[in-house]
């Protein structure tokens, strides 16, 4: 009997897969699913937390992800015309496109890129039920669905598409870059690894016993929610600004004040579904970060409580086209609006989306 090698095993697996496909072809015909957007109610007025630019054109657009969920986005396009490099932007975790992601997108459009800022599935103006739930799989797919949309626009060069994720969507962006070879450049700004923080707590303070108790509590909540016929919200930020911890006060300063409050933002209001964290606990986002071949830029604030997420993610990345930039004096939310290093981000995308 001949010894199996990795090559023969791969060939065997491929043969088995093709055999299954052939068997399926002989069975009763099944019509392929069509991509059908659901009707969304989109606002017509400018309701962002930042001023509208006179240098770019703006319009509302929609696209559909691989799970059939229709996503809503703001498109920002330079008024110069021509074929553009394009960037899809989303985040922070619990925010909407009218907040930080829209500011990133509009500013990068002023610098020559066609951009979209989208609401993730189940949030903002995007579709999907139940509302206010997060998923490491579906929300990673949201980025790839944005690439689907951009790659099929006549004014976008499909070989020049990048993505930018803020806060929790920074980790999603890295996961998308590991899976989607069409993505040529990725920026993760002030990133969270949502799998890590949900499974281990802040600063990895949660042990196995703590995880067990958390799972127990969340699964009991599932039963209660099902009995009640509705999903309980975890609650957003407190009504009054907390004295500590400082990073929660920083969040409050953005989401609960005129600086960043928005009526559709989960963080500005009732928060996520309580059980949303369950899927993140057992599904690590950065498993294949070391296999990302395209360019990656990690940006984080020097004084951010979350800085360790970017520093540890950077250790996983391989290749000379990966970089980590620490913004002096910046905390986590400073990179939502106040201290975003747009020159650095522009130079990165200009270099790798040629």
Task: Briefly describe each language-model feature range.
Residues 35-82:
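N-terminal cap/lid segment of alpha/beta-hydrolase-fold proteins
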Residues 83-92:
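Short beta-strand element of the alpha/beta-hydrolase
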Residues 94-106, 120:
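The serine-hydrolase catalytic nucleophile loop
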Residues 107-127:
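Conserved alpha/beta-hydrolase
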Residues 133-154:
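Alpha/beta-hydrolase active-site loop
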Residues 174-256:
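Alpha/beta-hydrolase-fold enzymes
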Residues 292, 298-300:
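Short beta-strand/loop motif that positions the catalytic acidic residue
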Residues 330-339:
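Catalytic histidine-centered segment of alpha/beta-hydrolase-like enzymes
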């Amino acid at each position: 009997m001949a010894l199996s090698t990795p090559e023969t095993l791969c060939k065997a697996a491929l043969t088995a897969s093709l055999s299954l496909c052939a068997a399926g072809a002989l069975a009763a015909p099944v019509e392929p699913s069509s991509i059908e957007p659901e009707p969304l109610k989109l606002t017509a007025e400018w309701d962002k937390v930042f001023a509208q630019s006179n240098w770019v054109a703006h319009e509302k657009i929609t696209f559909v992800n691989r799970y059939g969920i229709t996503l809503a986005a703001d498109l920002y396009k330079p008024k110069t015309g021509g074929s553009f490099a394009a960037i899809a932007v989303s985040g922070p975790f619990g925010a909407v496109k009218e907040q930080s992601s829209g500011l990133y997108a509009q500013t990068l459009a002023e610098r020559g890129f066609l951009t979209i800022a989208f609401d993730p599935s189940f949030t903002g103006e995007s579709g999907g039920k139940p509302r206010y739930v997060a998923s490491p799989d579906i929300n990673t797919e949201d980025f790839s669905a944005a690439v689907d949309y951009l790659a099929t626009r006549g004014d976008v060069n499909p070989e020049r598409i990048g993505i930018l994720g803020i806060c929790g969507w920074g980790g999603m962006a890295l996961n998308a870059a590991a899976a989607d070879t069409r993505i040529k450049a990725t920026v993760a700004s002030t990133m969270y690894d949502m799998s890590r923080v949900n499974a281990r707590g802040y600063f990895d303070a949660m042990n196995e016993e703590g995880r067990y108790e958390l799972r127990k509590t969340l699964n009991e909540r599932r039963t209660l929610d099902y009995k009640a016929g509705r999903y309980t919200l975890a609650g957003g930020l407190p009504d009054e600004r907390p004295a500590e911890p400082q990073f929660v006060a920083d969040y409050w300063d953005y989401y609960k004040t005129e600086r960043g409050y928005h009526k559709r933002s989960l963080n500005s209001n009732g928060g996520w579904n309580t059980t949303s964290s369950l899927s993140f606990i057992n599904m690590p986002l950065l498993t294949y970060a070391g296999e990302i071949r395209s360019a990656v830029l990690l940006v984080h604030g020097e004084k951010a409580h979350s800085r360790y997420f970017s520093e540890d993610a950077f250790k996983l990345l391989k290749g000379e086209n990966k970089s980590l930039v620490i913004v002096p004096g910046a905390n986590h939310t400073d990179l939502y609006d106040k201290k975003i290093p747009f020159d650095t981000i522009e130079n990165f995308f200009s270099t790798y989306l040629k």
